[in-house]
């Protein structure tokens, strides 16, 4: 990796600063919309809070942002980049060779991040629209919560509906809008604080610890469930590392943290000034002059949409990485934008829309959604902590120090998890069920792949070179295709799946000029595109190992065209001149791709558990993208052959021949 690349990644710029605001901080930047509201409502309303409660709450928020977001994610996790990419799956690829069981926290963390994130659009957009209740002239309309729900659903329908067309055209305004948003948070919070400068005392962690054990705190330790709402977007700082670079996050985070802390302090000051007024509005909107509220609601809605868009795009990236790591079913992926980073997965898009819409309809108010929000993300953070410990050890940190540092963060996050566990009975169960469903699918997919690797028998290609050469030269068989390509998941040295050789020689002898055996391997580097060729001492058998990064599309025909051209130019592969063609000088023949689908056979080597895994995986495959689409073969000639899962040492089933008995009287 060149020094120039490292410098660009670690360097900050004005443009990068603005871009980071629009991509990275949508979730954590919209938390002021609902965090203080949740704290006040759970305490019994504005008239039930005291100065010590407010100071303690603000202190808890400040130190939660400092410990989890600043120290863990900004100062530690951002250094764990995988060739400039971040996120839990990127972190997993860095440490997966250290222990096979690390796939478990990676799957759990990915599933909980995906499931809890499905609530973000519902919470943020609903909170923003509820701000219309504080707008003179519109309050009488939006006091009816049904109108809030309808408006929220319309926004969500439009937001999810435009994903298929790409969002690059609106992405350009994300940064400037979020800059205005954060500036407003900071300025309004600062002016609200001027009359209550005692809020600055909240910097002292004493107030945070005192509140946890104070009788004034009606919820005890469970207050941390609401406090955690302030930092739910911390994981995004790490996940979006590759989009904006480490340097831009280092520079932009202090600005963002200052603005959101000022917003929380400003809301706290307004609460102290109005705790006897009986006002029951969201402190975020109520703390702003009434004549500015309509503009604030508009700005808050834009910020909520940007936060939701960041979540949706992040979900697509997360699922795409899981598919390439072979721990998630293959779904159709399209690229509506101008670059590979703008991808779209239709199935995931509409599942997210369904979950988000059902959340709005089921919970109705943002307050009820907040009661369920944040539970699963605490698990994601715990899983990231586990993987980070292994990363620190891998990078040379003394094991005892790595254990101590990560044990501290694990303890803090586990306390937040316990505090959020009460949310399970208030709607958190929906998020947990969704997370468990995703983990189940991941487990089935991963376990099914391991079972196939365990039982499928491989043969040495060298033992069949002569047979394949004889078939190639045997004019008794019609030419099946000039080039026949087999895609194999399992190809090591000269060993290859027996089903492939069975297809060439036994099922129907396939005569061709060149036989291609292609294996696609996903590398730890996100944007690798390399290949290795072994001609096996022939000019008619080609073994190709494609090494593609876990963020690269696996469009095999495009890569194969380049490889064929390279081999012909180097003289390793004879030119395949065409007698009939509309392309003058064409020297590459036609290609046919043969895909082999393995299905569960009735052989008795499979245990009941293994059979359940394989049958469940087969059922899931019915709703996933076909290998033809996944490998970019839609416009190629493709043959699909179905074979039973070939097992080693197949057991013979006993059977006897019935012999006719001669008539005794004959």
From Swiss-Prot:
The keyword Membrane applies. Its main location: membrane. Keywords: Cell membrane, Ion transport, Membrane, Potassium, Potassium transport, Symport, Transmembrane, Transmembrane helix, Transport. GO terms for cellular component: plasma membrane. It is found in: Cell membrane. The keyword Iron does not apply. It catalyses: K(+)(in) + H(+)(in) = K(+)(out) + H(+)(out). One of its GO terms (molecular function) is symporter activity. Signal peptide: none annotated. The chain crosses the membrane at residues 16-36, 58-78, 100-120, 149-169, 173-193, 221-241, 253-273, 294-314, 343-363, 373-393, 399-419, 424-444. It is a multi-pass membrane protein. Transport of potassium into the cell. Likely operates as a K(+):H(+) symporter. Belongs to the HAK/KUP transporter (TC 2.A.72) family. This is Probable potassium transport system protein Kup. It comes from Streptococcus pyogenes serotype M3 (strain ATCC BAA-595 / MGAS315). The lineage of its organism: Bacteria, Bacillati, Bacillota, Bacilli, Lactobacillales. The gene is kup.
